[in-house]
Amino acid sequence: MIKKLLFLILVFIMVFFISPLVFSQEIPLVLPKITIEAGEASQPQELVLSLQILLLLTILSLAPAILIMVTSFTRIVVVLGFVRNALGSPQIPPTAVVIGLSLFLTFFIMAPTFSQIQDNALSPYLAGSITQEEAMHRGVNSLRDFMFRQTQEKDLALLVSFANLPRPQMRDDIPTHVLIPAFILSELRAAFTLGFLIYIPFLVIDMVVASILMSMGMMMLPPVMISLPFKLLLFVLVDGWDLITRGLTLSFR
């Protein structure tokens, strides 16, 4: 079931990769009419088709959550949230900007994996050279390879022990439903590590400003208000956004 969910999400993600090719060939597109009616089914296949449509609609509603769980989005958005809080401006950049930047960085970082899925799974499936099951297997394996590279062994060992599974000898012995939460734990650990490194210089500025204000007897003046311009100045002088983007990108290699 998890493999089918991941494959269907990958199909929708890869649409923008193949849409230029489709429109350049001027192939007439036939739009299907999908309806769900409450009535008596004359054949078992009609009930199965209706259930498949309902399952597809459910998958579409869960697509954002699945995208977050199996890609680099979690680490990126958490780190950018730490940047906002470390600067002392929780509302700037706005949440919409943070989410948008996280999505585009996710597509950039995941581009090799998506290209591999398109070449090995989606394109052969659309050409009719492989079956749906084989395409799902290849697509999920590409995502599993990415998640294995970013997952720490202790997180995998923790989830394997919770699942009461025997000690795996190969990667194929680890189920996808065990790999995904282990991957998320590793992503959160990496994001919090980067967040700690981001906080250190801004914390030093806060301590220096607070000490100066106390020595001048200005204890009623909020240190955060005074330190914010200095934090912004430091962030601009060191080209903070370039450093953050570079660090996030290199952390996945």
Predicted regions and their residues:
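N-terminal secretory/membrane targeting signals
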Residues: M1-Q25
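Hydrophobic alpha-helical segments and their helix-loop boundaries in membrane
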Residues: I2, F23-R253
